Each structure stands twice: as structure tokens, then as C-alpha cells.
């Protein structure tokens, strides 16, 4: 019904959408891979080896991975936020992050939109879309936490060095805060 109204008002037929996925009951997984480079110059081959030795490509039982990426690189305890190729070192670490939501929830939404002949082009975690809409490039580069306070939940997105590093949501929203304030005033 809402989509029909939107199509009527815009005088276009809605064929596809980008769909926000709430982060409540989501899963964040941090992992790491380490390889020895024995004083050699780091190349893309070393990076591929470190990625292949990790759980980066593994799926999560009952969860759909929405975002996965390398947070940073570590060469002999020095952190790099960009590709460390052409540097020399002994130990190369890659730090990974995966964000996932329950697979059944995602499948239900996909089926719902397929049933009304609307293609979902991309599933976007709600905290990420809120952050991209509100943070500028300086915020993301310097480091920022974007908290979107909703009625019954709040979503969180963290950026550092222009890189997303964490997404989550908690089941505390403005309704909870309002009730707490009212309770505090009444006593």
C-alpha cells in the first residue's frame, strides 16, 4: 500500500529498491590472520595468502553476512590503514570484520518484495545508511561514532581513518529514555 502511494505520487513504477536492514539481533565478528614474511618486501601475494589463511570467506551459520572487510593491516606491530605492499617486515597481520543479520529475517524480506515484483538491489545495514547520510568525510577520517536514536532501539556505526569499523544496534531507544526521565521526575 505504501509503495503504491509512493509510485502514484512520483508517477513512476517502483521496480527495485535499496532496502535498509535493522541491526537488532545482528552479529559482529572480528578475526585476524597472521603470516610470516621473513624480512621480505610485502606483495599482493602475501596479502592473498593471509586472506586465504583466514575465515574471511567462511559463512556464518544462520546468519547472512552483510558487510565484510579488512579493518587494518599490521606489519611488525605497526598499524597500516591502507595496503602495506612494498614495505618490508617479518610478521604480517590482517584484521577483519564481518557484520551479519539473521538469515531467516533477510529471506523473509526478500520473499515479501519478490511477491510484489520489486527487486532488492542492495541490502544496507541501517546504522551504515544513517552514518552515510549524516557524517562528512572529515568525520569519517578523524573517527566518529554515529548513533541513531530510534523509538525502541538505537543503531551505532563507527568510523576511523575513513573506514567503517563496527556496526550494531541496542534495544534502547527514545521511549526508554523518556520513561526513565518521567520516572526520575515523579520521585
Predicted regions and their residues:
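Nucleotide/phosphate-binding catalytic cleft detector across ATP-hydrolyzing
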Residues: 1-144, 163-165, 174
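Acidic, glycine-rich loop-and-beta core segments that form the ion-binding/anion-interacting portion
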Residues: 137-187
Amino acid at each position: 500500500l505504501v509503495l503504491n502511494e509512493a509510485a502514484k505520487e512520483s508517477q513512476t513504477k517502483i521496480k527495485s529498491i535499496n532496502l535498509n536492514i535493522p541491526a537488532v539481533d545482528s552479529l559482529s565478528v572480528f578475526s585476524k590472520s597472521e603470516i610470516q614474511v621473513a624480512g621480505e618486501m610485502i606483495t599482493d601475494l602475501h596479502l592473498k595468502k593471509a586472506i586465504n589463511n583466514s575465515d574471511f570467506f567462511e559463512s556464518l551459520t544462520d546468519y547472512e553476512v552483510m558487510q565484510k572487510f579488512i579493518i587494518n593491516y599490521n606489519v611488525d606491530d605497526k598499524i597500516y590503514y591502507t595496503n602495506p605492499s612494498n614495505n618490508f617486515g617479518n610478521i604480517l597481520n590482517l584484521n577483519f570484520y564481518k557484520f551479519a543479520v539473521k538469515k531467516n529475517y533477510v529471506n523473509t524480506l526478500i520473499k515479501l518484495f519478490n511477491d510484489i515484483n520489486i527487486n532488492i538491489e542492495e541490502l544496507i545495514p541501517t546504522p551504515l545508511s544513517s552514518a552515510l547520510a549524516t557524517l562528512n568525510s572529515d568525520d569519517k577520517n578523524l573517527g566518529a561514532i554515529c548513533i541513531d536514536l530510534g523509538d525502541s532501539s538505537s543503531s551505532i556505526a563507527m568510523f576511523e581513518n575513513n573506514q567503517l569499523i563496527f556496526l550494531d544496534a541496542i534495544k534502547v531507544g527514545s521511549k526508554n529514555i523518556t520513561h526513565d526521565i518521567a520516572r526520575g521526575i515523579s520521585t
